[in-house]
């Protein structure tokens, strides 16, 4: 079991290296932002959505890669893990709106948190930077897509076709009551959501020790 754990750990490290060797395209002139988007781009090109009626078995995140298919939450799970392996703080969690739960990935860049929708290929910008959580809560952002879109600016959001204005309004409403940056920062990284930090052996040991002493 320990051998398998370390084997998966080095698999993720190598995968990150391979992604950046393979993906030589530029999606943004800022390198930090470009790397965040390149990982999402790689996922969209290599992992397909699960179709209705398919059996889903998820022993660990590498299962997703081997199967090359994933549910929306599994996209976010794997994406947040790969971001952590690329030295970003990241987690994912479900956000409820109108009795529907939507998974999103959160990643910290330059001391602020931004939100990515890796399953649908959406990211949110303000000026020439990724929009902060507070920008999105205040409806001060634009939507960009890693998918090719048509001239009518229609997007697929969890299997529903919506135009840009409707989608922007919906994203704002989903996050309007969500945590601010300070609230996210105040939470221990192991308690923010997902399992992005628990694939690394050192982090896993720290997590288990903190659990034993009821610190988290």
Q: Which residues fall in each region the model found?
A:
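Small-side-chain structural scaffolding
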Residues: 26, 36, 76, 80-81, ...
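Aromatic-acidic/polar surface patches that form glycan- and anion
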Residues: 32, 68, 72, 164
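Active-site neighborhood of thiol-dependent amide/isopeptide-bond enzymes
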Residues: 46-104, 108
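His-Asp-centered catalytic microenvironments across diverse enzyme cores
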Residues: 101-103, 107-216
């Amino acid at each position: 079991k320990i051998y398998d754990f370390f084997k998966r750990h080095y698999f993720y490290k190598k995968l990150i290296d391979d992604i950046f060797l393979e993906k030589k395209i530029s999606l943004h002139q800022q390198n930090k932002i470009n790397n965040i988007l390149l990982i999402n781009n790689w996922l969209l090109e290599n992992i397909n959505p699960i179709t209705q009626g398919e059996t889903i078995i998820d022993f660990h995140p590498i299962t997703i890669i081997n199967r090359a298919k994933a549910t929306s939450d599994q996209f976010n799970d794997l994406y947040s893990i790969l971001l952590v392996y690329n030295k970003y703080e990241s987690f994912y969690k479900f956000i409820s709106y109108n009795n529907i739960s939507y998974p999103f990935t959160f990643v910290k860049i330059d001391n602020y948190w931004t939100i990515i929708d890796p399953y649908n290929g959406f990211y949110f910008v303000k000026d020439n930077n990724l929009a902060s959580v507070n920008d999105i809560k205040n409806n001060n952002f634009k939507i960009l897509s890693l998918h090719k879109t048509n001239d009518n600016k229609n997007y697929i959001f969890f299997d529903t076709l919506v135009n840009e204005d409707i989608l922007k309004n919906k994203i704002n409403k989903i996050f309007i009551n969500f945590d601010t940056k300070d609230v996210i920062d105040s939470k221990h990284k192991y308690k923010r959501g997902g399992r992005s930090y628990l694939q690394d052996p050192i982090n896993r040991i720290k997590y288990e020790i903190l659990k034993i002493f009821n610190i988290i």
